[in-house]
A protein has these predicted regions:
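Non-catalytic cap/lid and distal C-terminal segments of serine-dependent acyl enzymes
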Residues: 1-213
């Protein structure tokens, strides 16, 4: 789907899949609507679309994350998690503000914004395109130390609907290696398609690693 609404996780059965973590109060799941139909998948002016994506990023980083932290007396930082294009958003948020998060799980994300803008890129979209801003990050940038203090997962399958995710995840793996950034980059098999069936399995598989359990 091109628009991921906040009830998608519950509708897909993710709350049931993660019940033991939720019921045991090991995690709290907070989901957020996207506006991808106005940004990544719109036919409108490209600069306006890029501005909409930046506004979404700022909303989550500056309003949603503080709200999430206010819900609990836990001192732990939240984990940025997303599936499909939600994985793209989760990665952008984490890579731009690793100080806000304890870790990242990006499933079936795509990391080259230019693909969705006909090869076009401006300064605003650059900030939302990990395959553009990460290669230019200086080796001494303080975020690299923060990245390496966190647990990051980038996972994609090699089945239907995942060509762009597979392509950009492979490129991202190379960039992370070149920058000396540690991450778990995992490619599942050719039978692993785009969709909740596999994302739920991947969440169960990777969540203990990111939570340190």
């Amino acid at each position: 789907p091109r628009e991921m609404l906040s009830d998608a996780y519950e509708a897909a059965g993710v709350t049931e899949t993660l019940a033991r973590w939720l019921d045991g109060r090991m995690i709290r799941l907070v989901t957020v609507d996207t506006i991808d139909s106005e940004s990544w998948f719109s036919a409108d002016d490209r600069e306006w679309r890029a501005n909409r994506q930046e506004a979404y990023y700022e909303y989550v980083a500056e309003e949603v994350v503080p709200f999430v932290r206010s819900l609990s007396d836990w001192t732990r930082l939240p984990v940025s998690v997303g599936c499909g294009f939600g994985g793209t958003h989760a990665a952008i948020l984490f890579l731009r503000r690793p100080d806000l998060f304890a870790g990242l799980i990006s499933l079936a994300g795509s990391y080259d914004a230019k693909t969705f803008f006909g090869g076009w890129l401006n300064a605003r979209l650059y900030d939302n395109s990990p395959l553009d801003f990460l290669p230019n990050m200086a080796n001494e940038h303080p975020y690299i130390e923060i990245y390496n203090a966190r647990k990051m997962v980038f996972c994609t399958g090699q089945g239907e609907g995942l060509d762009e995710s597979r392509r950009t995840t492979d490129l991202l793996r190379s960039v992370l290696h070149e920058r000396g950034i540690n991450a778990w980059v995992d490619f599942w098999g050719a039978d692993v398609d785009y969709g909740w069936e596999w994302w739920k399995k991947q969440l169960v598989y990777f969540l203990p690693y990111v939570l340190g359990r």
